[in-house]
Regions:
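A short, polar/charged loop-to-alpha-helix boundary motif
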Residues: 80-100, 349-357
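Active-site SXXK
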Residues: 69, 92-122, 145, 210-214, ...
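Short, charged, amphipathic alpha-helices and their helix-cap/turn boundaries
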Residues: 45, 49, 72-75, 85, ...
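Active-site Gly/Thr loop motif
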Residues: 238-245, 288-338
């Protein structure tokens, strides 16, 4: 039987937490239930492949594998380099950078505000830069922003020249140049390149526009941090999660959350369980489904994008958060699996990394239940 159409076909059911398996406890120690991988899954081989610095995946810092709600394998290696202190070895308590996986966390925050009745997906958003009468950007909806079909001109290019600069890249200028103090304003100031809704354009600027909308609702700076802690990271026990805000008080949701690998796995488990955590429905299950339904094909690499998440058409319902240098949280409902991989993989090796993730998912999906 061929896989269901990822755009229109039925979504596979999301598994519940198995009876007798406790939810991960709160606190910096992680306090995850642990278990063994199923018979026939050679996890040591798969982890060796990921952690071979001379192999196609390059530098892997952390891998955490959660099966049926239990950590069944994890591995840490390498050192984090910093300009102001000696390199530090990576371990279970090391906060690592999400890069664009933060976009998927923004999806959760928007879902909370939609459920609260404070945001409407289908009404034009209130963005100050678009408030002038007749501005065609004023018709852009939150739904179009989440799908990255807003039509705004934004160049997402991380290549640097010999002077470590890229003067044609909007994302470099936003994160590290003229836009760094107010990322939402920088991105919202971009002109239209296409009518809203017409085509897909992957854009970190789009995510930061959405984050600016959230900041105006919940309050910038510390109130925003508290909202993230009280409504998302705190309830799932992700004590290490640290979102970074810019000088304007906007969470740079395109790129910046530091957390341990196990705490990133908590976020994946929240989505695998349909927004439910330890007896509480934190996010509506219907909102989780908006992360699982493909809406666009990324013309740069053929991947399927939903709403700030990525969808794999493998017949297993797999969807994922992905970030620069190969960060990923892979969620597979059919295998009841969360796979976290963090590291520093150059973009020309992304196909090999996606292939490795697919091998891990397939190994668990094919294992006897």
């Amino acid at each position: 039987m061929s896989p269901a159409d990822p755009f229109t076909g039925p979504l596979p059911p999301l598994p519940v937490q198995p009876a007798g398996t406790p939810w991960p406890g709160a606190g910096p120690d992680g306090d995850w239930p642990e278990g063994d991988p199923p018979a026939g899954v050679d996890l040591e081989l798969l982890l060796d492949q990921a952690c071979d610095d001379r192999g196609p995946l390059a530098r892997t810092h952390a891998v955490v594998v959660v099966h049926r709600g239990r950590v069944v394998a994890e591995r840490y290696q390498g050192r984090l380099e910093s300009f102001d202190r000696p390199p530090e070895p990576v371990g279970p308590t090391t906060p690592l950078l999400s890069w664009s996986m933060a976009k998927s966390m923004l999806h959760a925050i928007v879902g909370l505000l939609v459920a609260d009745g404070r945001l409407d997906l289908h009404r034009p958003v209130a963005v100050p830069e678009w408030a002038t009468d007749g501005d065609p950007r004023g018709s852009i909806t939150l739904d179009q922003l989440l799908a990255m079909r807003d039509g705004l001109a934004f160049v997402e290019d991380y290549g640097l020249d010999e002077h470590l600069a890229n003067r044609t890249s909007d994302v470099i200028e936003m994160l590290f140049g003229a836009g760094r103090d107010d990322v939402a304003h920088f991105a919202a100031d971009r002109p239209l390149a296409a009518p809203p809704g017409e085509r897909f354009n992957y854009s970190s600027g789009t995510s930061d526009i959405v984050s600016g909308i959230v900041a105006r609702l919940v309050g910038p700076g510390d109130p925003y941090r508290r909202f993230l802690a009280d409504r998302l990271f705190g309830p799932i026990g992700a004590a290490s999660a640290r979102p970074a805000v810019d000088e304007a008080g906007t969470w740079v949701a395109s790129s910046y959350v530091h957390a341990t690998a196990r705490d990133f796995a908590r976020f994946g488990l929240l989505y695998l369980r349909g927004g439910r955590w330890d007896g509480h429905q934190l996010l509506p299950s219907a909102w989780i489904d908006t992360a699982r339904r493909a809406r666009s094909v990324d013309p740069s690499d053929g991947q399927l994008h939903s709403n700030h998440w990525w969808v794999t058409p493998d017949g297993l319902g797999t969807f994922s958060c992905q970030g620069y240098e190969g960060q990923s949280i892979t969620v597979c409902p059919a295998a009841d699996l969360v796979l976290v991989r963090l590291g520093k993989t150059p973009s020309d090796r992304y196909p090999a990394l996606r292939s490795w993730r697919a091998d891990v998912v397939a190994a668990f999906a094919q294992a006897p239940s």
